[in-house]
């Protein structure tokens, strides 16, 4: 009886170890991206790197360090551009491409990215807000109001911020 218990215990332990080994190898294989010409970075890590740069740029912007902020926005743009090359159907990436360009003053190109994003997701909150902000910045208030109308059903932060900006102008 003791021998049987030891054998069962051994088999259970062996089974658990094999399972753990299998899962860790599977996770490792699933997580590796290989070399894709950008130091092995996939679209997700490029996107996350870009977002981190945007957050840093916003901090400099709040401190009125505009030139430093612009440099970071341009670095972020490069990350998002590489991510977009790998995923042309991602409205979030297009939103950030437009955002970073708008923040550096390239309104025309920013608008093209926002419009591409709206073709993928016409209700995208960020794109509608930021495109509305771009329209305000370029003196096209009526177009900004159209973006506000799209956001009106959500009663969200994006709606409130765009509404306030339009009212100020």
Question: How should each PLM-predicted stretch be described?
Answer:
Residues 86, 120, 151-154:
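Structural marker of alpha-solenoid helical repeat scaffolds
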Residues 42, 90, 124, 156-159:
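Residue-level recognition of tetratricopeptide repeat
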């Amino acid at each position: 009886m003791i021998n049987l218990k030891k054998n069962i215990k051994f088999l259970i332990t062996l089974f658990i170890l094999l399972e753990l080994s299998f899962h860790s190898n599977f996770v490792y294989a699933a997580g590796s991206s290989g070399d894709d010409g950008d130091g092995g970075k996939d679209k997700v890590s490029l996107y996350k790197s870009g977002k981190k740069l945007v957050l840093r740029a916003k901090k400099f912007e709040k401190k009125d360090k505009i030139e430093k902020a612009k440099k970071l926005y341009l670095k972020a743009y490069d990350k998002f551009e590489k991510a977009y090359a790998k995923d042309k159907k991602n409205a979030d990436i297009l939103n950030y491409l437009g955002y970073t360009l708008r923040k550096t003053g390239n309104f025309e190109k920013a608008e093209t990215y926002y419009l591409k994003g709206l073709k993928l997701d016409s209700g995208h909150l960020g794109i509608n807000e930021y495109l509305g902000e771009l329209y305000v910045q370029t003196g096209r208030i009526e177009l900004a109001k159209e973006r506000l109308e799209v956001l009106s059903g959500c009663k969200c932060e994006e709606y409130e911020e765009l509404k306030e900006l339009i009212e100020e102008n």
